[in-house]
Amino acid sequence: MSLLVDTSVLIDHLRGHPGARAVLEQGLAAGEVHASEVTRLEVLAGMRPREEAPTRRLLTSLHWHPLDDAVAERAGELGRAWLPSHGGIDAADLAIAATAVLLEARLLTLNLRHFPMFADLARPY
């Protein structure tokens, strides 16, 4: 199964967390690790100047997916289904979830409550 990585795991990797490094290295060794362009935006927006080189190296190792019409449509469907009972989900999380659904990918995230639409979601480390 392919993997879609969320911002939280990438940030942990950049901070040297062994679990994040291991899960990404395993994913990359097994094939492509995917990410939403929303994740790239979040990572770049929070990047400090001294983190630029390692951040850009990490970002080049991922397969990126745009927020296109298919993602927007699916994100809208997910929002209508889940926002009435889970108001804390934001548009970025809906777009990331929609990308994972469309790719049929396993989502790697630490923010489990942002993604209630994945019944079997668990922390990756």
Task: Please state what every model-predicted region is.
Residues 20-21, 40, 52-55, 72-75, ...:
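A general structural signal for well-ordered alpha-helical segments in protein cores
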